[in-house]
Design a protein with these regions (language model features):
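Conserved beta-strand hairpin/beta-sheet module of binuclear metal-dependent hydrolase folds
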Residues: 1-44, 116-131
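Active-site HxH/HxHxD metal-binding segment of metal-dependent hydrolases
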Residues: 9-10, 24, 31-106, 192
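Core dinuclear metal-dependent hydrolase active-site scaffold
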Residues: 16, 93-124, 155
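Divalent metal-coordination and catalytic microenvironments
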Residues: 17, 28, 53, 65, ...
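Active-site metal-binding loops of divalent metal-dependent hydrolases
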Residues: 29-31, 54, 78-79, 111-112, ...
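Active-site-adjacent loop/tail segments of enzyme domains
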Residues: 134-160
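Accessory terminal helices/loops
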Residues: 151-161, 170-253
Length: 253
């Protein structure tokens, strides 16, 4: 399976997966034109569309693509996603014959209440829940819900590749540095990110193990993040620590 991040809109990624026989899947197609161009350039046939949540920058092109290609649209059970043809839920499995791939569906509420992730082919397609060096804003869910969702993702194999929905890594990295300025693995990641963005190259996908070593939202149980929280008057449970770091990020940018 080949993975291609398609830049779209302001800073979104539409994820394109395809096999050697020309069969393709797209994830969170906010812009149908970007997908059509990529399919034509690679001579691919669109076989399925996966949606993680209802925000327009992730679903805006789904209806048009379904109309053009008759590809099923897998989506959360959320009436705000009108383009859905197959509603999926936590614990479901999606099995496709062309391309031959299987995805496990995981509910990860927080950014939105009906947010889903798709796990398969060595990939974590996680929309706006987990970014490199960051996580999504809590538009609908609570800090406890978001932390529980991130815990679920953190338990996945370390080699799985995180495919978030936006190119936010530089800004996220600057914030992460304020939380853990002495983290050597974070320093290395920031150097890599700077070099990649200087060449206009994506900073995703990234192995989950590297996020576990550098992403402050996955590290609320570490001594370093706990120390930062104590410096800011938070000496409580892990949900409070997560909420404090998320609030600080909201004020950071």
């Amino acid at each position: 399976m080949h993975l291609v991040p398609l830049p779209a809109l302001l800073d979104n990624y539409i994820w394109l997966l395809h096999d050697d026989d020309g069969n393709a899947i797209v994830v969170d197609p906010g812009d149908a034109g970007v997908v059509e161009h990529a399919l034509a350039a690679r001579q691919l046939r669109l076989r399925a569309i996966l949606l993680t949540h209802h925000h327009h920058d992730h679903i805006g092109g789904a209806a048009e693509l379904h109309g053009q290609h008759a590809a099923p649209v897998y989506a959360p059970d959320d009436e705000r996603i009108e383009a859905a043809t197959v509603r999926v839920h936590d614990g479901d499995t999606i099995e496709l014959a062309s391309p031959r791939v299987r995805f496990d569906v995981i509910a990860i509420p927080g950014h939105t209440l009906s947010h889903l992730a798709y796990v398969g082919a060595g990939l974590l397609l996680c929309g706006d829940t987990l970014f490199s060096l960051g996580c999504g804003r809590l538009f609908e869910g609570s800090p406890a819900q978001m932390l529980a969702s991130l815990d679920r993702l953190s338990s996945l194999p370390g080699e799985i590749l995180v495919c978030g929905g936006h190119e936010y890594t530089e800004t996220n990295g600057r914030f992460a540095h304020t939380i853990e300025p002495e983290n050597p693995e974070l320093h290395q990641r920031l150097q890599e990110v700077s070099a990649l963005r200087a060449q206009l190259r994506p900073t995703l996908p990234i192995a989950l193990a590297r996020e576990l070593a550098t992403n402050p939202f996955l590290r609320v149980d570490t001594d370093a993040v706990a120390a930062w929280c104590r410096q800011h008057g938070i000496d409580s449970d892990r949900v409070a620590r997560f909420a404090a770091v998320r609030a600080a990020k909201d004020e950071f940018c």
